[in-house]
A protein has these predicted regions:
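Low-complexity, Ser/Thr/Pro/Gly-enriched N-terminal "stalk/linker" regions
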Residues: 4-78, 96-142, 178, 182, ...
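Solenoidal tandem-repeat scaffolds enriched in leucines and small polar residues
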Residues: 161, 169-257
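Well-ordered alpha-helical segments within folded domains of soluble proteins
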Residues: 13-23, 71-91, 141, 145-165, ...
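Catalytic cores of secreted or luminal carbohydrate-active enzymes
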Residues: 364-371, 376, 381-425
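Positions within ordered alpha-helical repeat solenoids
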Residues: 48, 88, 108-111, 115, ...
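C-terminal beta-sandwich/jelly-roll accessory domains of carbohydrate-active enzymes
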Residues: 407-507
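Extended glycan-interaction surfaces of carbohydrate-active proteins
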Residues: 53-68, 152, 219-272, 278-279, ...
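Structural helix-adjacent loops and short alpha-helical linkers that scaffold large soluble proteins
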Residues: 16, 20-40, 89-103, 163-177, ...
């Protein structure tokens, strides 16, 4: 690892390069060690942010961290993003504090932030606390008190459903169903100027906002996933979810996927603005749900190329990296947006075998580590320490990148990287890794520091296979003892979600 001759700084650190002048992370030249260090630092800072004077955790009430306490309230999708990252972090680390924080966030929001059952738009979360330290979410940052954002409701709904599958608490299922029922009842076909649900709407009256842009947003990946999972679980009103899902899918194919109107998203922007996040999250959905669109590969590639062409910036081209800007009204490359785009590129490479963008995606992940200080402060470049961009909408991109490319996970450590079912409980012990999935049938990916002596599902020993492809047809596991992703462990089970991965005795 080398410093440029002029020791240029990026974020909190002096830029580091490899022997060819390409950007590597400040934290370590090896991506896995670097990302592991950054994840640990960010999480440590996050869980020690402290509380406000009213006793509520700082993270639950503010969108920006400052030692003197920032005057603004929540970010629009801040709590849903947090649940998303914490779910992945719990599987990766086994830290019970991550799981406990998920419960605290969900319970707080359900107790202090939803529209009334009698409202025109009932049982949906408000995205903002207009009186910051009131302990209540009751409106929209720009439209004002009483307004909510249906797209953020869908995103929070799928995270509630994940938490239900993790904990078994019916409260989270009931709330997720309530969100889905309202969205299914309010869906419209939409058109080029109106999405199937508005971006900002008055909860009590159903009127659209006039103080801020209201009729359209393309941020519906969370809502698609909410409907998908309720249909799979046969919970709530599956038929209504199916109909709403079909209308939403038709609209996405007819409009954003054709005209590239991928805005807006952000709570603090009152006007129209095209965004990276809405586009790239739909590309992620396409790659994870190829059955949704026959042209999934071409359309995912088109979205990723659009993002790069629209929001890529060449200020760091000499280091082989193109950071990604946030949106058209704020053309500043960001830690969350660059790492998200990179993680979707990594998934694209995994799903298609086309690795043309993979090396630069790793450099994009490297670039975004520079915004993290040694103590875990994570600052948007030339801006504030945003609790969306630096925390909930940051960690998940590194964890997803590791899942798509296990060689990016730390070597010599044990980490679960991905599961097709929700991880209810996981323990990384000295003699074994033990975990339990919500579904009896699931597939997991780990990177571990040992070759398993045995793996059981519900006490029944799983067979080892020499090729990962064998798991496409049967239960068992595959372990890579060597190669760039040495320690890769892939497990498939069909009859029990209780898994024990045992080490050799005495190790």
């Amino acid at each position: 690892m080398a410093l440029p001759t002029w020791a240029e700084r990026l974020g909190y650190h002096e830029i580091q390069t490899d022997a060819t002048g390409q950007l590597v992370s400040w934290a370590a030249p090896d991506p896995g060690q670097a990302y592991g260090r950054v994840i640990a630092a960010v999480w440590d800072f996050w869980k020690h942010m402290g509380t406000c004077a009213n006793g509520v955790p700082y993270f639950f009430q503010h969108q920006v961290w400052k030692p003197e306490h920032d005057g603004r309230g929540l970010g629009g999708d801040q709590l849903a993003m947090a649940l998303s990252s914490l779910n992945l972090l719990y599987g990766y680390s086994g830290d019970p504090e991550a799981r406990a924080m998920m419960v605290r966030i969900a319970d707080y929001y359900l107790d202090h932030g939803f529209s009334r059952p009698t409202d025109a738009w009932p049982n949906l979360p408000f995205p903002y606390n207009t009186d910051v330290h009131s302990g209540i979410c009751d409106g929209d940052m720009r439209a004002g008190k009483g307004f909510l954002q249906p797209d953020k409701a869908g995103a929070f709904g799928i995270e509630l459903l994940t938490l239900y599958e993790m904990t078994g608490s019916p409260r989270y299922l009931t709330a997720a169903v309530g969100i889905a029922n309202t969205l299914a009842a309010k869906v419209t076909p939409g058109d080029g100027e109106h999405s199937p649900w508005p971006f900002r709407v008055q909860a009590q009256t159903g009127e659209l906002a006039t103080r801020a842009y209201a009729p359209y947003t393309a941020n519906w990946t969370g809502t698609l996933r909410l409907f998908d999972e309720l249909i799979r679980l046969k919970q709530g009103k599956p038929a209504a979810c199916h109909s709403a899902h079909a209308l939403l899918s038709a609209w996405l194919r007819a409009y954003p996927m054709k005209n590239d109107k991928w805005g807006p998203f952000f709570e603090d922007v009152a006007e129209w603005s095209n965004t990276e996040i809405n586009a790239d999250t739909l590309a992620w959905y396409l790659l994870e749900h190829p059955q949704w669109d026959a042209g999934w590969r071409q359309n995912a590639r088109a979205i990723l190329d659009w993002t790069l062409g629209t929001f890529g910036t060449n200020g760091w081209a000499r280091y082989g990296v193109t950071p990604i800007q946030e949106q058209t009204v704020y053309r500043v490359p960001g830690n969350s947006h660059t790492s998200r785009h990179a993680s979707v590129e990594m998934l694209y490479a995994e799903k298609t075998g086309d690795c043309a963008h993979k090396a630069e995606a790793i450099r994009q992940l490297n670039w975004a580590t520079y915004m993290v200080d040694d103590d875990g402060k994570n600052r948007y470049p030339n801006d504030d320490i945003w609790l969306t961009d630096g925390y909930g909408d940051y960690l998940r991109h590194y964890l997803r990148a590791m899942a798509a490319a296990p060689e990016l996970a730390p070597t010599g450590q044990d980490h679960l990287l991905r599961s097709s079912s929700v991880i209810q409980q996981i323990e990384y012990g000295k003699e074994a890794i033990r975990y339990r999935t919500f579904d009896a049938a699931s597939r997991e990916r780990l990177r571990v520091a040992f070759e398993p002596a045995s793996i059981t599902a519900g006490g029944r020993r799983l067979r080892k296979y020499e090729r990962m492809e064998d798991l496409d047809r049967r239960e068992g596991y595959f372990f890579a003892a060597s190669g760039s992703a040495s320690g890769l462990l892939e497990i498939k089970h069909a009859r029990s979600g209780t898994i024990v991965i045992s080490q050799e005795p005495g190790r």
